[in-house]
């Protein structure tokens, strides 16, 4: 991944003026756009309840899951809010092929002092946790069990990440935020619409502070 993002929220913005929602709430934001900030869709229409839930995640460091049918704009809702906050945002699609190694990192062969050596390269999860980034896990209910257990500690507000490969405990950046989207809230698919989704450990589901629903 790229170098660390040495930035922090430096302004407050009005929810009413920015999102057209009746609310006295003000939220933290960045005054300048930086790398990884999504593009703004000026025509995007925000759902009030979903928007307030997501903004609570940004403002109060709450873990927020957005559940709903396919095509309802769950991920877009998060990225369009991030775009207006100038909050760097990274999306990871947790399909069944994403493994622990993909998220945590792996050993790579690199050249140093004209010699080939093996060096551990951190993955997207350690990098995100150490930066002021909104990390979005799409298709959360399709992830593999080994990935689910990896994320349990990260779901805690102050939860660090233990990088065994480097004997290192990573402390989250104060402005790291975590979101997820799902079709079934981890209860499994009884409709036949979402083949490949999994049941999720209840202890992990309980770690999501806010679960909001966005449907047609």
Predicted regions span which residues?
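AAA+ P-loop NTPase catalytic core and its hallmark functional loops
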Residues: 1-216
């Amino acid at each position: 991944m790229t170098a660390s993002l040495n930035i922090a929220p430096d302004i407050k913005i009005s929810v009413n003026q920015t999102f057209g929602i009746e609310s006295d709430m003000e939220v933290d934001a960045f005054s300048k756009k930086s790398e990884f900030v999504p593009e703004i869709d000026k025509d995007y229409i925000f759902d009030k309840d979903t928007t307030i839930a997501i903004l609570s995640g940004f403002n109060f460091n709450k873990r927020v899951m957005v559940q709903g049918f396919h095509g309802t704009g769950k991920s877009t809702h998060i990225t369009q809010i991030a775009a207006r906050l100038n909050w760097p945002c990274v999306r990871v699609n947790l399909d069944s092929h994403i493994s622990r190694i993909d998220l945590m990192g792996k050993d790579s062969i690199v050249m140093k002092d004209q010699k080939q050596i093996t060096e551990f390269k951190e993955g997207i999860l350690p990098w995100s946790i150490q930066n002021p980034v909104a990390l979005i896990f799409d298709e959360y209910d399709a992830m593999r069990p080994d990935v689910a257990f990896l994320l349990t500690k990260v779901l805690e507000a102050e939860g660090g990440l233990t990088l065994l490969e480097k004997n290192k405990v990573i402390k989250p950046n104060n402005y790291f935020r975590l979101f997820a989207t799902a079709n079934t809230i981890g209860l499994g698919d009884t409709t036949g619409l979402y083949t490949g989704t999994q049941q999720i450990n209840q202890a992990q589901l309980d770690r999501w502070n806010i679960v909001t629903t966005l449907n047609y």
